[in-house]
């Protein structure tokens, strides 16, 4: 969350990219720099570290410990999707694969046009390679889909199953391990009002040609091997 730590993370990732490039030339194999999901180890490692090193810093001090995955922001950092994107856009393009920005929403967007507008703004103004729109929803055995996190069905009062994305896929929150469950409780979601705030995002919108055509994105050097140049 701090500028110094973001710069340190950039230096570390660039160093790892350079080392991987050296290894590819040395061994003739291909290597990836990935932000692995760590849906189990982010809790397991934190739990064991707390036993052996009680003073170690983890997420959610004083309760169920867990680690924030890879170079993601702390889950409770902000409710402003563009503030989060500004930080992650410095880091996620440095991975060569296996990275994603999850746009966690408290509930689904009002319609497909709102979703399309958000997707377009991210695509046109940021370089990160992958991102998702990840609303939370609930399922009632009798009434089916319910928008947002609703522990009890508003129609019949029956207990529901709350679903959210755990790393790359949706699962019932009740089946998550203790660390991921704590992460879900700590998570700030990006509110619809902030996502739809045109004034907030206005200065991020680049000018786009109205004519139909193709856009080719290139990099100065090959991200996987410095021996190959465009």
Language model regions located:
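Local sequence-structure signature of Cys/Sec-based thiol-disulfide redox active-site neighborhoods
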Residues: 205-229
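Long, C-terminal-biased catalytic regions of enzyme "large/alpha" subunits
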Residues: 1-202
């Amino acid at each position: 969350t701090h500028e110094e730590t973001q710069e340190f993370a950039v230096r570390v990732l660039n160093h790892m990219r350079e080392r991987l490039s050296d290894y590819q030339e040395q061994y003739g194999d291909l290597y990836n720099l990935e932000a692995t999901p760590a849906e189990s180890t982010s809790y397991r490692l934190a739990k064991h570290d707390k036993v052996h090193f009680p003073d170690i810093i983890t997420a959610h001090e004083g309760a169920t410990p867990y680690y924030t995955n890879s170079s993601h922001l702390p889950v409770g950092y902000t409710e402003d999707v563009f503030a989060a994107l500004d930080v992650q856009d410095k880091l996620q393009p440095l991975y060569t694969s296996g990275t994603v920005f999850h746009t966690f929403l408290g509930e689904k967007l009002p319609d497909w046009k709102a979703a399309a507008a958000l997707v377009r703004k991210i695509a046109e103004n940021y370089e990160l390679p992958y991102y998702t729109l990840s609303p939370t929803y609930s399922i009632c055995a009798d009434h089916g889909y319910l928008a947002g996190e609703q522990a009890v069905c508003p129609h019949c009062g029956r207990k529901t199953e709350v679903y959210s994305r755990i790393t790359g896929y949706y699962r019932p929150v009740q089946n998550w391990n203790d660390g991921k469950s704590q992460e879900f409780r700590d998570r700030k979601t990006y509110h619809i009002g902030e996502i739809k705030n045109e004034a907030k995002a206005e200065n991020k919108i680049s000018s786009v040609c109205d004519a139909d055509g193709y856009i080719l994105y290139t990099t100065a050097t090959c991200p996987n091997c410095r021996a190959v140049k465009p």
